[in-house]
């Protein structure tokens, strides 16, 4: 798998040209705020209703299969997102990023608030699947627009900021969902309406990158259109699928690992998870300051993640488990923007929507199967800690393979990322 991820060619589209839009001033801040807010909407869909699932379970107790169906209300948007993001990417390239983003943001509010008026559990799950459709378009469009608006070091910086915002918002939305859920299990669904405030601002403040690209690239019309980079994107997407499992292991399994050590206090579990989440944010901030190619960073990042899993596997006490989780999450904080930046460096403007959709599908597909894979590993080795240790060993193998691939490709001493020119 690692050998299928070659370094960018000398003609990679991630050239040192200045960012095509202003990178300072009020317009820039508003544009960046909207893109970050849009990127957080799929996270909201993933965690907002988690605290009220027990209340939903009680409400639909008389519905056949409710014990299995109610959790689907939480997870089915991620599955829809993973399945449909590639199609969203194709639509992005054909219809335009901004137009699809605005439509999807409005539909997000419509589908997200639907459970306020639906009484059937099946209908609610159906509306949640449609939320995932809107999320696929929103995430693909926001990430693609970051790639369109910014280049070089600015692009790296803002993709890392996207990872920071989505990681921090997950914790915030979980707290908000729990607080609002005190008013009833339907109450958190009102929060989906916030996207109706964002959509008109996006329409007014986000420039249309298609028009800009058409004027800037007009002199190159005579040049033959290069084919879509299927082979390098396949390698990046395979890495991303595995990386998503690495990324989500601590958030999904930390409470169970603590329980295995005899910790049942929700406050202690919440504090330990919050500390690990803070390390994820710190890792993304560290990545934003790196001055080397993301391809060179990936072996070290996977090695850090694997080392953290190794400590967690060996941990016989809560403090050591938390240390391992912090090490792992420091690595995963760098992993997400490293993978995304590496993918972006291989995509021309006309391919960026499709490529971003494929990457998004790979990431959320890995997130969806993460607990299933760990469950299978746990059954095989007889314990969750052992399953985490196996995943850490796999991360170490991937790190070694990537390092070897870079050496074979002569990329051990790559060019540094371009400095900001605006």
PLM ranges: what are they?
Residues 152-154, 161-211:
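Helix-loop-helix hairpin linking two adjacent transmembrane segments in secondary transporters
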Residues 294-339:
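C-terminal transmembrane helical hairpin of 12-TM major facilitator-type secondary transporters
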Residues 82-122:
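Conserved MFS/SLC helix-loop-helix module at the cytosolic interface between two early adjacent transmembrane helices
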Residues 121, 127-167:
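Cytoplasmic helix-loop-helix junction between adjacent transmembrane helices
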Residues 83-96, 282-295, 378:
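Helix-to-loop junctions at the C-terminal end of transmembrane segments
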Residues 107, 111-114, 122-131, 319-327:
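Paired small-residue
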